From Swiss-Prot:
HAMAP family: CPSase_L_chain_A, CPSase_L_chain_B. It comes from the Bacteria. Belongs to the CarB family. Mn(2+) 2 binds at residues 298, 300. The keyword Nucleotide-binding applies. Residues 936-1068 are annotated as: Allosteric domain. The lineage of its organism: Bacteria, Bacillati, Actinomycetota, Actinomycetes, Propionibacteriales. It comes from Cutibacterium acnes (strain DSM 16379 / KPA171202) (Propionibacterium acnes). This is Carbamoyl phosphate synthase large chain. Residues 936-1068 form the MGS-like domain. The keyword Membrane does not apply. Mn(2+) 3 binds at residues 820, 838.
Length: 1068
């Protein structure tokens, strides 16, 4: 069928902020879809609340709305734009839920708007657990015994009928949110209670556990003419019981027989056809390893996390094809963009193995529950390609950027046998390393299979890696052993450790022996058809398929896996840098390891190398490509950390030079530069031992801010208020040493703000100044930022411009620079002073936001500067650009509901996973939008629980008066209530945790657990009891989905919004 000509304007719904379970893969999918629809001649309207995405750039859609994805705002856009159709299947769970909500509201029918792609009835059959079970029963497709429940009592009855263990799956939630495995009634009651609250339809499926079965995924594609195909098959390393987003995954499937594959393929095709899917669809199945019994676990009737992985694994652009199917085209009418010669109905063939490993946030959250189950916890993932499982697995391990380049983790190697056994029984993020260590200690593959239910085939591959280790030990300096190790994915540093040499020694030996990688093309057809895809992976074979271009080229290093502190913002900057490189006439080469991102779409760059971002792997590409230089400014700390080794190896680093990058990171060097330039900074010092840290803190006076150097996202940063706290920090959080110093600063309590600037070595452009709502002490990535500044005096703004210009020149910046300031009173003079907190001579996470609100594509301008142009050449004047008339607010978004035991209190260590943006004519309206977009819905009335420290009580009293004035009922613990009462404000009392007696006042936890309040304001204290109580309060509020504020500044911002939305009622 030809494309539909009765449609002209199409609305695409994005997926909103990055959350655990819904990450950058939807920016990749949405960008592909918008461009595909524009390619077909349609006018595309986009709504998304995430400014850090490529899809919200002005040139991706014809009209871009960065607005909350809520019924209120999407309805308003629909009424204003009157599109002919909506595509909801490219925005993840957010898009599907929005489509369902819109349909129930009747607005699409009222306006005559059609839902494109998979129909709403099919979405409901796949997403509604009861309807899905009924459909599978009708098809004769086996599903685990299950019942849908809407109350805890119903769940208990079902549990008694089906028997334990059970799996709880809440309806219409993301990444298994609220679900889990239950071994007894107590666990069932707890998990179902949470799941019902988090399900937007208050519904859970209670399902017979099939933990231990193989988990298989089929990524499917179907068009309106019923052409149905398998794009990719994937097999989880972990058996059923671990969420697929938290499992190591291989593509294609590795352990299925032809009979098993055909059986599951037929089942997937039948399901997709019966549902009437039009576009992409993911089918998850469980297979009994000892029989042909299988069960259908679930179907995702949309582009998903697995779709992005399948796209990058095969080269087949699923979202692009799905978008074209949505407007009527069929698979035999859509040309495969990879080969350019075949049609999209040909199923991709792989002559390589793909490995995906999740990237978890537990390096940031040491206190988190690291056990894996049916609720996803990973923030991102890496992918690696190789000719064997061993090669792709080891390449993926070193892509994780966790300080490990092989199957050896020191903390696991040091575990006692009993603890290691415990970790083998209960899957954790370090399971792969635990399995390896168990084999090292003499456990057999069969024993481990019986204990973990992981297939013997995969365990054999791990054992084979250890056999190669032993051969290397037995044959030091043997070129044949070296060749075998490299073919199976061993890194130079791993081999060097085994041989007792340096990585350089190994590198020289293998190059001298002709042991160098070749690069193979990803072409979707295993070489069967001619292809010229510029998408490559390395392996150790004979024929090289990547040829050096004759044009001058530049290599851009990506930012690797998404994790807290280094998210999609850096991929945004990478993509824009590539655009500028191409516009300047160079060939742009990208190297990255993240399958979720736009940067690893092979159509973005002239060449894509899907490789680990390590010195060895980067040098291998440089040896082949001989680029004119490497750009490291847009790949976050990942790329910055590679600048020094690459420069030492003679590689030209373009832009700001390594010595100046180091000077910004090195505390003493940076201090001396600021002193030389006459720029104030917080008094502080550098400690290379615990004793030095105590001495510096004693001299400065508490509180102090302590942090390691060379980190991103405020990792291991803390505000310390006493010597006892500092002792605990030095013991638990960091290990100070001469080469890893700890920085100790006086904590300055004031207004925090930041700038992103571009410098050509002489002139400095400052697109904008951002002002934080939360005062200093909350990490900038966790603070709400406002542009233009609202509380800043002109004198302070002028001083910031002056300091930024001085510092950019002082650091000899060529490219981009981020500087963070705190405006506070000088302790000695009492004068308002602008202090520099830190300077980062690289792109920051605010670049996408500031680029969008100022209209300056900062990464593109900075790249042109890096390549040798000046601001004057580009027609840009130095100094601060005029402020916009509209107010723009950027707000962090958190995933605490997915991370049990992680404290939601905000401080100097970053915890947010994503961001949203709101723009309007007033601050109050912009704030309202970001609160709605962040799912912190602003109530019009209700009860607010306030529990704060003694030093925060005076400020909290003033805030409480404002809430009281607009009609909110207030409740607090005894101490807070007494203080408020003395200040003339009566509030209800809730007992502190553990102090209530039978018949006494309700406790704080009871109040929260019965949803007896509509918001919680909890400011943490330093006493041990207060810390424990505060954690329990915050954890319960998160579990109940109650808006939680741990900063009075954020609470004051939401109060300001509420005040703007109500009429005052005062007696005369």
């Amino acid at each position: 069928m030809p494309r539909r000509t009765d449609l002209h304007r199409i609305l695409v719904i994005g997926s909103g902020p990055i959350l655990i379970g819904q990450a950058a893969e939807f920016d990749y999918a949405g960008t592909q879809a918008c461009l595909a629809l524009k390619e077909e001649g349609y006018e595309v309207i986009l709504v998304n609340s995430n400014p850090a995405t490529i899809m919200t750039d002005r040139d991706v859609a014809d009209k871009v709305y960065i607005e909350p994805i809520t019924l209120e705002f999407v309805s308003s856009i629909l009424r204003r734009e009157r599109p002919d159709a909506i595509v909801p299947t490219l925005g993840g769970q957010t898009g599907l839920n929005m489509a369902t909500e819109l349909a129930k509201s009747g607005i699409p029918d009222e306006l005559g708007i059609e839902l494109l792609g998979t129909k709403l009835s099919a979405i409901e059959k796949a997403e509604d657990r009861d309807l899905f079970k009924q459909l599978m029963d009708e098809l004769g497709q086996p599903v685990p015994a299950s019942e849908v429940v809407h109350t805890v009592d119903e769940a208990v009855k079902v549990g008694n009928t089906i028997g334990y263990p059970l799996i709880v799956r809440p309806a219409y939630t993301l990444g298994g949110t609220g679900g889990g495995m239950c071994c007894d009634e107590a666990e069932l009651v707890r998990i179902v209670g949470k799941g019902l609250e988090l399900s937007p339809v208050t519904e859970c499926l209670i399902e017979q556990s099939i933990a231990g079965f193989k988990e298989i995924e089929y990524e499917m594609m179907r068009d309106g003419a019923d052409n149905t195909m398998v794009v990719c098959t994937m097999e989880n390393f972990d058996p059923v019981g671990v969420h697929t987003g938290d499992s190591i995954v291989f593509a294609p499937t590795q352990t299925l027989t032809d009979v098993e594959h055909e059986m599951l393929r037929d089942a997937s095709i039948e399901i997709v056809r019966t549902l009437g899917i039009e576009g992409g669809c993911n089918v998850q199945l469980a297979l009994d390893p000892n029989s042909f019994q299988y069960y259908v676990i679930e179907v995702n009737p949309r582009v998903s996390r697995s779709s992005a992985l399948a796209s990058k694994a095969t080269g087949y652009p699923i979202a692009k094809i799905a978008a074209k199917i949505a407007v009527g085209l069929t698979l035999d009418e859509i040309r495969n963009p990879v080969t350019g010669t075949t049609w999209s109905m040909f199923e991709p063939m792989l002559d390589y193995v793909v490995a995906k490993i999740p990237r978890w946030p537990f390096d940031k959250f040491a206190q988190a529950d690291r056990r894996l189950g049916t609720q996803m916890k990973a923030t991102g993932e890496v992918m690696a390609l190789g000719r064997t499982i061993e090669e792709s697995l080891l390449k993926a391990v070193r892509s994780l950027e966790i300080g490990v380049d092989h199957l050896a983790l020191r903390e696991v190697a040091d575990l006692p046998d009993d603890i290691l056994e415990e970790r083998l029984l209960h899957a954790r993020d370090d399971r792969l390393f635990c399995l390896t260590e168990a084999i090292r200690r003499g456990r057999t593959v069969q024993e481990l299979h019986e204990q973990t239910r992981i297939d013997v085939f995969f365990l054999d591959k791990v054992a084979h890696i250890l056999e190669i280790e032993e051969r290397l030990r037995a044959c030091p300096d043997d070129s044949e052993a070296l060749w075998i190790a490299k073919r199976n994915g061993f890194s130079d540093p791993a081999i060097a450790r085994i041989w007792g040499e340096t990585p350089d020694d190994v590198r020289v030996r293998r190059v001298d022996n002709g042991i160098v990688p070749v690069y193979k093309m990803v072409d979707t057809c295993a070489g069967e058809f001619e292809s010229s895809t510029p998408y490559f992976y390395s392996t150790y074979e004979m024929e090289n398929e990547s040829k050096k271009s004759q044009r001058p080229s530049v290599l851009v290093l990506g930012s690797g896996p998404i994790r807290i502190g280094q998210g999609i913002e850096f991929d945004y900057a990478t993509v824009h840098s590539v655009k500028a490189i191409q516009a300047a006439g160079y060939e742009a080469i990208i190297m990255n390891s993240n399958p979720e991102t736009v940067s690893t779409d092979f159509s973005i760059s002239d060449k894509l190398y899907f490789e680990p971002l390590t010195f060895e792997d980067v040098m291998n590409v440089i040896d082949l490509e001989q680029p004119d230089g490497v750009i490291v400014q847009f790949g976050g700390q990942t790329a910055i950390n590679l600048a020094g080794p690459l420069s030492a190896a003679g590689v030209p680093i373009l832009g700001t030079q390594v010595a100046d990058l180091d000077r910004a990171e090195d505390r003493e060097g940076f201090e001396s530069l600021l002193a030389e330039l006459g720029i104030p900074q917080a008094p502080g010092g550098t400690a290379r031992s615990s004793e030095e840290a105590f001495a510096v803190a004693e001299e400065l006076g508490y509180p102090v801010l302590v942090r390691p150097s060379y980190v991103i996202g405020g990792r291991a940063m803390a505000i310390v208020t006493s010597a006892e706290e500092l002792k605990r920090y030095m013991r638990d959080a960091v290990h100070a040493s001469p080469d890893k110093p700890v920085l100790v600063d006086r904590y300055l309590n004031g207004l925090e703000c930041e700038v992103d600037a571009i410098c050509d070595g002489t002139d400095v452009l400052i697109p904008g100044i951002m002002e934080h709502i939360e005062r200093a002490g909350v990490h900038s990535g966790d603070s709400m930022a406002v542009y233009p500044p609202q509380r800043m005096s002109q004198q302070v703004a002028d001083r910031i411009i002056e300091v930024t210009t001085k510092l950019a020149r002082g650091l000899k910046t060529k490219g981009i620079l981020n500087i963070q300031f705190v405006v506070a009173n000088d302790p000695a003079t009492g004068e308002e002073t602008v202090y520099v907190i830190e300077a980062n001579p690289r792109a920051s996470r605010t670049v996408p936001f500031l680029s969008k609100v100022t209209g300056v594509s900062m990464a593109e301008v900075a790249t042109r500067i890096i390549l040798g142009e000046t601001l004057a050449d580009l027609g840009l004047r130095p100094g601060l650009l005029p402020f916009s008339k509209r107010i723009h607010v950027k707000s962090p978004v958190f995933s605490f509901s997915k991370l049990d035991l992680v404290d939601s209190h905000l401080g100097p260590e970053m915890k947010s996973t994503g961001e949203v943006m709101g723009s309007d004519d007033t601050v109050e309206k912009a704030l309202y939008k970001v609160f709605e977009a962040a799912n912190l819905h602003v109530p019009e009335y209700g009860k607010i629980l306030i529990t704060v420290t003694d030093d925060a009580k005076p400020e909290a009293l003033q805030l409480a008066r404002r809430f009281d004035r607009i009609g909110f009922q207030l409740v607090g613990t005894m101490g807070t209530a007494r203080f408020f009462d003395e200040g003339g404000l009566r509030i209800d009392v809730a007992e502190k945790i553990g102090s209530g007696e039978a018949g006494s006042t309700e406790s704080v936890l009871d109040l929260i657990s019965r949803n007896g309040c509509d918001a919680v304001i909890n400011v943490m204290g330093n006493g041990q009891d207060t810390i424990i109580d505060g954690k329990q309060i915050r954890r319960e509020a998160i579990a109940r989905g109650i808006p939680l504020f741990t900063s009075l500044d954020t609470a004051a911002a939401i109060c300001r919004v509420m005040e703007s939305r109500v009429f005052s009622t005062e007696s005369i």
